[in-house]
């Protein structure tokens, strides 16, 4: 399930584009997540009242959370699969405090792929999409394993 060096390079190349505008990418990814899967909004007290994409775009809290999410994910991706230290506290908080099901991590992975494809078509072709999908699946599988250790059935 691991990625080749070339695949990791592809992931990190496009991630450099994300880091150039964490707020913009994070906002778009969360809006995509919440509009495609409105049930995910229920896990976010700060965002439950946001019903339209325009309301979501106007939310500074949503923008800040997008930066938080993508900063954490970037730190994990840069570890190229050697992310045990980063995954453990994330799994702990998402299992015990936030109670985020693995299915929702699949949903946000889809939102990430969609937004990167729309914002960076020249840098995110089929090979890059495949590499990112594998990297996100590796992340989800490792989170799911930690959830299991914690007794969370998410």
Curated annotation (Swiss-Prot):
Organism per entry: Nycticebus coucang (Slow loris)
E.C. no: 1.7.-.-, 1.11.1.-
Modified residue annotations for Phosphoserine: 4
UniProt-annotated binding residues for heme b: 94
Protein name: Myoglobin
First-level EC class: oxidoreductase
Subcellular location: Cytoplasm, Sarcoplasm
GO cellular component: extracellular exosome; sarcoplasm
Annotated catalysed reactions: Fe(III)-heme b-[protein] + nitric oxide + H2O = Fe(II)-heme b-[protein] + nitrite + 2 H(+); H2O2 + AH2 = A + 2 H2O
């Amino acid at each position: 399930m691991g990625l080749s060096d070339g695949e990791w390079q592809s992931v990190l190349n496009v991630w450099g584009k994300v880091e150039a505008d964490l707020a913009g990418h994070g906002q778009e990814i969360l809006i995509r997540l919440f509009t495609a899967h409105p049930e995910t909004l229920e896990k976010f007290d700060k965002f439950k009242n946001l019903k339209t994409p325009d309301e979501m775009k106007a939310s500074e809290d949503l923008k800040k959370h997008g930066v938080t999410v993508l900063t954490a994910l970037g730190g994990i991706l840069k570890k190229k699969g050697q992310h045990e230290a980063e995954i453990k506290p994330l799994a702990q908080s998402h299992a015990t405090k936030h109670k985020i099901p693995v299915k929702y991590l699949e949903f946000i992975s889809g939102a990430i792929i969609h937004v990167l494809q729309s914002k960076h078509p020249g840098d995110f072709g089929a090979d890059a999409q495949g590499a990112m999908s594998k990297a996100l699946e590796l992340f989800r599988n490792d989170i799911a394993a930690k959830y299991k250790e914690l007794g969370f059935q998410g």
